[in-house]
Amino acid sequence: MSKFQHLITVSPLGLMYGSAGAFLSPENLVGRAGAKFPPDTGAIAGLFFNANREQKFVDRKELRDKLVVSGPFWAKKDKPKEFYVPIPWHQVLAEKEDDEWVFAKKKSDEEVVSETDRDKWCLGQHQWERKNKDLKPEYSWQSIDAWNLPANELREREAYAKAPWEFVSFLHPKIKSEERHVVEKDGLFLENAVQIHEDYCLVYLSNYELPNGLYRFGGEGHLVEIESHFLSEKHKINRLLSQQIQHAFALIAPGVWGSNKLSYRYPIHPDFPRQGLKILTDKAVPYRYRLGHSKKEEEVAEAEILYDPKKTGRLSRGRYAVPSGSVYVFKHPLNRTWWDFPDEWFPKEGFHLKHLGCGLCLPIDIQGLPKCTEKPTE
């Protein structure tokens, strides 16, 4: 488990469906409260296990123990390997302006600094600052090929974008079970559909190949076209993931930390260096997935009895995740890659959530911090 070898594209054949999230308030008549899209990696992992049950392209136990997936990202269909990832929160891109959060030295009249200490960098003596605090981000995605570039260079290269999908909410009739008529009471319910522009596709990363074909995917199980593309060691994402993180990283996938019962903003583990930790983030997002079927149901499936994935499995424990783009800054160099993060940093529910790509992160440079990264070697 040291690199992603396959890039999986998901191309809808029509509308897709996202989760309505944690709640739907009476005031929100368009049903967009907490709307959640694209589908989390739990959905793509489910595709692997269901496809393997039918096609048997890898040993089931090996797949369960070693499968690692991550995402969601997106790309143009004709350039899937030039996919887009969330912009780190320290970079703010609006329509005509941009800004960055930087670390500036705290002002202290009483502080007396010797010549020997003047050159030493100390996180506790710095604080977050930016020039235009009223500027709101209007773009949230950037090309992976432009990772770690300053906001002004992202603008110059036009390497940033808005999400290529739109939410479409409509009233859906509830049909009687015995006849094709709408039920008399509560016969309409609000449904959240998502329309992806036809030239774009969703992207997920994996260390196993998913056979090409048509699959049912996401909410309501609508048909999508799946294609797997080989990802070389020299691809930008693999080169970035091979670099050790020094003083800072940014999440490109939701971060689910904490214990099996509680969600935290960082790993609750003695090996995690949380002393002096500084985080730049937004409000937490709901995180949940379907666990799949039980051992008894596996035995039924193995006996070749009709298996319906819609009627099996149970939902995982509801958790909150740190949103993608969140920035973590450490007092001392972390000297780890994401692949080096121990499984114990992640909750476990049948398997550690690292296998679902939780907390996937890349090293970043922030003005005011010691240089964190070097350019990836070609």
Task: Describe the role of every protein-language-model region.
Residues 2-378:
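Conserved active-site/ligand-binding neighborhood in enzyme cores
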